[in-house]
UniProtKB/Swiss-Prot annotation:
Pfam families for the chain: DUF1899, WD40, WD40_4
Subcellular location, record wording: Cell surface
Any single GO BP term: mitotic cytokinesis
Species assigned in the record: Dictyostelium discoideum
Domain of life of the native organism: Eukaryota
Gene that this sequence comes from: corA
Assembly, per entry: Binds to F-actin.
A GO CC term assigned to this protein in UniProt: cell cortex
Name recorded for this polypeptide: Coronin-A
Keywords: Actin-binding, Coiled coil, Repeat, WD repeat
Family statement: Belongs to the WD repeat coronin family.
GO MF terms, alphabetically ordered: actin filament binding
Coiled-coil region list: 410-444
Main location as per UniProt: other
Stored PROSITE patterns: WD_REPEATS_1, WD_REPEATS_2, WD_REPEATS_REGION
Length: 445
């Protein structure tokens, strides 16, 4: 009996290895062991965390500047290593960074890109007591970002006003990922305690939580429409993929073993085409799956294979895809010295706009102000048609940062409390120095 082949318009999606001249070469990508993607992108630029001594730096490079680089200007205002970066979704000339120095910085990108290094951010946000590991901007509310830190806290910020909006508690260990849902009303986190948690950040309430993976290595979670995707490791160190309904956050709707490689899986979800991309750190493969609403909820499509292992990955906004070539996704793959564009395409010959694979997509325009969002208002993301092709925004959106004055202790009690906090911070930093000294001795012996 012949096997019935499942029908899907994405069954033959393919990706090809880019040409050398299309890659960004001679880059000094960070050697940090932190489980970040190391790269982020908007329609004009991509940013990559830099390997720099004596502080934290990252580069922002225009997409058209492919080929060999000689001298790259940097954003270099952090006092310790940069751990994560994210572009503002509504302002192409703003980028945020977080660091081991406990600060969140918002930087302005000059029109046309950097020509000289910049050391002074437009805005510095302080409030975390340990290193800040992740940053992500709200997809609908203007100037709202979320960060997570080694102090086990998740904080939301108004980056223009320089204010901490809300603080989410409830984690008992290091937070390994923190992502918004599609309309910015909830966040999902994963933690070293092996749990995935869905929060309402405006009320500091846990919507649901579950032990998602039994392995000791890091896990990650993202929203995929009304589902939650988690990736992590089993007790026997196999890489796993789970799909959950966050309203019944107990048993996964689907649980798959991906392989037995050792690197963390990085998940990316394309809401327009319902495609999930999985890229493994330390290997050169990018698997992609189609998600559906009924069991088994996920179908493997294909795999991009490369001999060059990736250290990080990100995807560009759908607005800058080449629709005339049926390009449905474009990723940027990070290696130790290059960033390589990977284009995913549907093999079709027609030059007519293919509206079945290009529904209206995320417009990159705010639906809410920060004030509306924090008051409890929800809204759907604005969308735009790709039928007319990609049109760059005429100019940057105005950004007027308000610098908050940091008030010192007002009396003896507050002074003593601040003193005790600083003692704890000094003890933590001293322990980190001891660990790094031991690591240096181990590597030199």
């Amino acid at each position: 009996m012949s096997k019935v082949v499942r029908s899907s318009k994405y069954r033959h999606v393919f990706a090809a290895q880019p040409k050398k001249e299309e890659c960004y070469q001679n880059l000094k990508v960070t050697k940090s062991a932190w489980d970040s993607n190391y790269v982020a992108a908007n329609t004009r630029y991509f940013g990559v965390i830099w390997d720099a001594a004596g502080g934290g730096s990252f580069a922002v490079i225009p997409h058209e500047a492919s080929g060999k680089t000689t001298s790259v200007p940097l954003f270099n205002g952090h006092k310790s290593a940069v751990l994560d970066i994210a572009f503002h979704p509504f302002n192409e000339n703003l980028v945020g960074s977080v660091s081991e120095d406990c600060n969140i910085c918002i930087w302005g990108i000059p029109e046309g890109g950097l020509t000289d290094s910049i050391s002074t951010p437009l805005q510095t946000l302080s409030g975390h007591k340990r290193k800040v590991g992740t940053i992500s901007f709200n997809p609908v509310a203007d100037n709202v970002a979320v960060t997570s830190s080694g102090d086990f806290l998740v904080k939301t910020w108004d980056v223009e006003q320089g204010k901490n909006l809300t603080t989410v508690e409830g984690h008992s260990d290091m937070i390994t990922s923190c992502e918004w849902n599609h309309n910015g009303s909830q966040i999902v986190t994963t933690c070293k305690d092996k749990k995935a948690r869905v929060f309402d950040p405006r009320t500091n309430s846990i919507v649901n939580e579950v032990v998602c993976h039994q392995g000791v290595k890091n896990s990650r979670a993202i929203f995929a429409k009304d589902k939650v995707i988690t990736v992590g490791f089993s007790k026997t160190s196999e890489r796993e993929l789970h799909i959950y309904d966050p309203r019944a956050f107990t048993t996964p709707l689907s649980a798959q073993v991906v392989d037995s490689a050792s690197g963390l899986l990085m998940p990316f979800y394309d809401a327009d085409n319902s495609i999930l991309y999985l890229a493994g750190k330390g290997d050169g493969n990018i698997r992609y799956y189609e998600l559906v609403d009924e069991s088994p909820y996920i179908h493997f499509l294909s795999e991009f294979k490369s001999a060059t292992p990736q250290r990080g990955l990100c995807f560009l906004p759908k607005r800058c895809l080449n629709t005339s070539e049926c390009e449905i996704a474009r990723g940027l793959k990070v290696t130790p010295f290059t960033v390589e564009p990977i284009s995913f395409r549907v093999p079709r010959k027609s030059d007519i706009f293919q509206d079945d694979i290009y529904p209206d997509t995320y417009a990159g325009e705010p639906s809410l102000t920060a004030e509306q969002w924090v008051s409890g208002t929800n809204a759907e993301p604005k969308t735009v048609s790709l039928a007319g092709g990609f049109v760059k925004k005429a100019s940057a959106v105005e950004f007027k940062p308000v610098v908050q004055v940091q008030e010192g202790p007002k009396n003896e009690k507050e002074l003593r409390e601040e003193y005790e906090k600083l003692k704890i911070r000094v003890a933590y930093l001293e322990s980190e120095i001891v660990k790094k000294d031991a690591k240096i001795k181990e590597l030199t012996n």
